[in-house]
């Protein structure tokens, strides 16, 4: 199967299925002599781990990572880093009824159409279980970013669940780690809890929007035309399971703005570098970073596995009905937050190495950081 690798210089390949023995990744292009151990990677995996609240799948996986290669005495060696996560809580019996039936909204039919065979247990390779491997790769990417000329911070938050959006006037990054939703607003988190309890008890699911922000990225990362930084970020987010839309900066809202409103004006900063008065561009112009915060949002569709009976067909082409059993996320967007962070880190690590290889030194540091406190996009 093609399409299992991502990146150019910093490149990772993931492997494994939802109910297979293990999942993991091989990360290539990691510079030597970077500190890396399992405890560092585990910290990021624990944020994504299932079973931590009633609002996510109750599959109990410790997601304990093992470093199998590429590290010696706590430092990377410059050779491929292989990371393994053993699956420990598969319940394949829950999926016996779908061996010969295609679940609406899942990749069952498309995998069968392409390969003539599919692993029906938990979705196999198409399961969101694969994203744990990306989070592990993202941890390695963060070590690469630590060698950049200035600190690069990648943070994510859930900003919408169903019709309910966060109150950006109350945005607090510290609040993200205090609730089970990665929500930057305590009031909205409480509302989401009540809302999702109703969704969960009904056996249904709901979509969400995730926002990922990178601060401290110097001006100059990215390439023009076909290798744009925002192009790679959009592709990265679209590879995440259940993601159906991506926007950068003002994104689709830019269609409603005038040219005067949309273009980010500049003043001269004390260091002679531009000081942007807004960040509608989301930190990228012409495919190259501006030095401002890079702001990406992506929409996650509702989990397709629900208890409501749905019409479908079986492998013989007969119409039938299906109710999906198993342990599923009522809102898969919650655990997509650490995954989005990981993909942002991987793209930035790749472009950092590419920029350094091309010009020999990083670009100048711009005026990064939020334009207004609590609002990464600004206005």
Swiss-Prot record:
Root EC class: lyase
| Claim: Flavoprotein is one of the keywords in the record | yes
GO MF annotation list: chorismate synthase activity; FMN binding
Q: Which cofactor does it need?
A: FMNH2
Q: Which reaction does it catalyse?
A: 5-O-(1-carboxyvinyl)-3-phosphoshikimate = chorismate + phosphate
Look up the EC number in the record and give it.
4.2.3.5
Q: List the disulfide bonds.
A: none
Query: GO CC terms for this protein?
Result: cytosol
Q: What note does UniProt attach to the cofactor annotation?
A: Reduced FMN (FMNH(2)).
Q: Pathway, according to UniProt? A: Metabolic intermediate biosynthesis; chorismate biosynthesis; chorismate from D-erythrose 4-phosphate and phosphoenolpyruvate: step 7/7
Which ranges form a coiled coil? Answer: none
According to its UniProt entry, one GO biological process term is:
amino acid biosynthetic process
Where along the chain is FMN bound?
Answer: 125-127, 241-242, 286, 301-305, 327
The cross-references to Pfam families, in alphabetical order and at most eight, read: Chorismate_synt (PF01264)
Q: Which UniProt keywords apply?
A: Amino-acid biosynthesis, Aromatic amino acid biosynthesis, FAD, Flavoprotein, FMN, Lyase, NADP
Q: Which residues bind NADP(+)?
A: 48, 54
* Highest taxon of the lineage: Bacteria
Q: Which family does it belong to?
A: Belongs to the chorismate synthase family.
**Quaternary assembly:** Homotetramer.
Q: Which NCBIfam families match?
A: aroC, PRK05382.1
What this chain does, per the record?
This reaction introduces a second double bond into the aromatic ring system.
- By what name is this protein known? Chorismate synthase
